[in-house]
Amino acid sequence: MALYNPYRSDMVATLGETTGFVARQLMLYRMKQDPVGREILRLQPRVKSWTVDLNEMRSLQEGTFGREYARFMDDNGLDQDSRDDVKFVDDIELAYVMQRYRDIHDFTHTLTGLPTVSVAGEIAVKWFEMVQTGLPMCTLGSIFGPLNPEVTPKHREQLRSYYIPWALSNGMKAKFIMNVFYERHFEEPIDSLRKKMNLTPARRLDGW
């Protein structure tokens, strides 16, 4: 079910934790090679309602990363506390790597400009995350997700012709998403942060 339906967050979370040991090790290694990544591992920040105040984000200047993140959460009716905690990864460091990946998912949506209101939007993000992280759950979701009956033929064609090539290109050239301390960039213009990350947001095609 998790392969076809990225909305089943419980099953997606379980699949992510029970697969991908080697990918998590590589993610941890890449974080340890980067000064910001090391700081994130040391401080282990979480993205929860008590750590990131959406009311404060809503009050930020238009066009800032924090304001756009709050808008994304509001527009999609999302809850910061809905992300499951990691349960099936025993190693403390590797468990946090998985948790951080999960916690920043909505930051990734915000920065890439990809919607979460459709299965197709989640599939496009999974392609980007697959290239960035190598996690099997992202790979499987990328491959099998388009077979979901909720993905319309039009969206399937748009994935093939634009969003998947966009995800592959940006996934390879963009800064490693795990090595960005997003919480320190809320007051920065979102386009400035994208530039620092070498990330080009996806265009919104018709129907997205």
Curated annotation (Swiss-Prot):
Cofactor(s) listed in the protein's UniProt record: Zn(2+)
Intracellular or extracellular location(s): Mitochondrion inner membrane
A Gene Ontology biological process term: ubiquinone biosynthetic process
Any one Gene Ontology cellular component term annotated for this protein: mitochondrion
Pathway: Cofactor biosynthesis; ubiquinone biosynthesis
Keyword set, alphabetical order: Lyase, Membrane, Metal-binding, Mitochondrion, Mitochondrion inner membrane, Ubiquinone biosynthesis, Zinc
Binding-site residues for Zn(2+), renumbered to this chain: 105-106, 109, 122
Protein EC: 4.1.1.130
Primary residence: mitochondrion
Catalytic activity: a 4-hydroxy-3-methoxy-5-(all-trans-polyprenyl)benzoate + H(+) = a 2-methoxy-6-(all-trans-polyprenyl)phenol + CO2
Alphabetical list of InterPro entries matching this protein: Coq4, Coq4_euk
UniProt topology in membrane: Peripheral membrane protein
Described purpose of this protein according to its UniProt entry: Lyase that catalyzes the C1-decarboxylation of 4-hydroxy-3-methoxy-5-(all-trans-polyprenyl)benzoic acid into 2-methoxy-6-(all-trans-polyprenyl)phenol during ubiquinone biosynthesis.
The protein's assembly and partners: Component of a multi-subunit COQ enzyme complex.
Miscellaneous notes: This protein may be expected to contain an N-terminal transit peptide but none has been predicted.
Family indicated by similarity: Belongs to the COQ4 family.
Name of the protein described by the UniProt record: Ubiquinone biosynthesis protein COQ4 homolog, mitochondrial
